[in-house]
Amino acid sequence: MKKMNRVVITGYGVVSPIGNDKETFLTNLKQGKHGIGPIQQFDASETGITMAAEVKDFPLEKYFVKKDTKRMERYSLYAIYAALEALEMSGINTEEEDMERVGVMIGSGIGGLGTIQDQVLRMDAKGPGRVSPMFVPLAIVNMAAGNVALRIGAKGICTSTVTACASGTHSIGEAFRNIKHGYSDVMIAGGAESCINKIGISGFAALTALSDSTDASRASIPFDKDRNGFVMGEGAGVLVLESLEHAQKRGATILGEIVGYGATCDAYHMTAPDPEGEGAARAITQAVQEAQIDPAEVNYVNAHGTSTQANDKAESKAIAHALTDNAYVSSTKSLTGHLLGGAGGVEAVATLLAIQEQFIPPTANINEVDPEIKANVVVNEAKETPVNYAVSNSLGFGGHNAVICLKRWEA
């Protein structure tokens, strides 16, 4: 039987509503400082939704020139930025690597939704002949991965997982398996999204999925008894994954290890989770079993925790079924909002930092945990505690469930 590779994390990058660099992101994560506020990117007055979690002060000039904004959608820019930050942290020199053994897997739930909106309006107003020739390459969902590969010269596998809000975690999990089974030495993996625009907000509002709160501090409140929907976020989170052998050979600083991955489907409903959380529980169990640990060894669960009534209740049942009361639970969406396909990437970074820094990020702005939530939820203040194993959950429309299990690195 072929020996399986261990898979380690050697770099990460993040673009998020609570920070675009590791120091700011970590500080806000520890302090429970949210990035939610009134929508600035367009006039949302007709949508009935006032709050979103937007990226602030994006340092475009660090890696891009002005023409890049015409040739790439915002979600691609976020993905490239996070990938380049992750590569820089990892210390990988692309000129010295066998780039045919370097792959990219970056998921997105919707891709260039803003471009689709703008070009449909342009076609309606001016006719088909005035549709931009850049429409298709800007709009298609795989171009975050494609643009990252183009930028760094990665010639291995390059894919984009599209599983709604599970996209980022699926991408990281599949990248983990790709290295584990020996197909790649290095993978750039994560998720990216940017659809805070009129059609994006209007569409999710029509589903009654969004919070209509006008109070930024009470809009995204996962597990709270008064939760009433999620807050749209945007950004990207990207990890550099390597085989342990490859990382050690080049003397890399190892930040953590991915030891398990689970992926299942509810096969229950287009947009609602299985109310018993059966599919999510199986995904957690798969990840823990692949990690070859007892469920009681999981110290922290970074929950999908969207702040919707249905998700939080079902997910808490899944956690209770698959794990034990030893696991602390929190949802960092109380800080970042819901990044859809980008959520899994950013939350993987948050989970890694929880392991590195030995703390549980808080679920912020909670007044009272819903009595029907049976999870051990950490609220309002970070908790310092040993974290050796943690899981990060992502659940998406279509019944998609993806879970990764991370382990603290001890040299």
For each feature predicted by the language model, list its residue ranges.
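Glycine-/small-residue-rich "gating" segment that lines the acyl/pantetheine channel
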Residues: 125-132, 170-173, 177, 193-249, ...
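A glycine- and small-aliphatic-rich helix-loop capping segment at beta-alpha/alpha-beta transitions
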Residues: 23-28, 114-128, 178-181, 201-214, ...
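Active-site-proximal alpha-helical scaffold in enzymes
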Residues: 79-92, 141-145, 149-154, 158-193, ...
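Active-site-adjacent elements of ketosynthase-type condensing enzymes
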Residues: 44-54, 111-115, 194-220, 262-282, ...
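Conserved small-residue
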Residues: 11, 29, 83, 104, ...
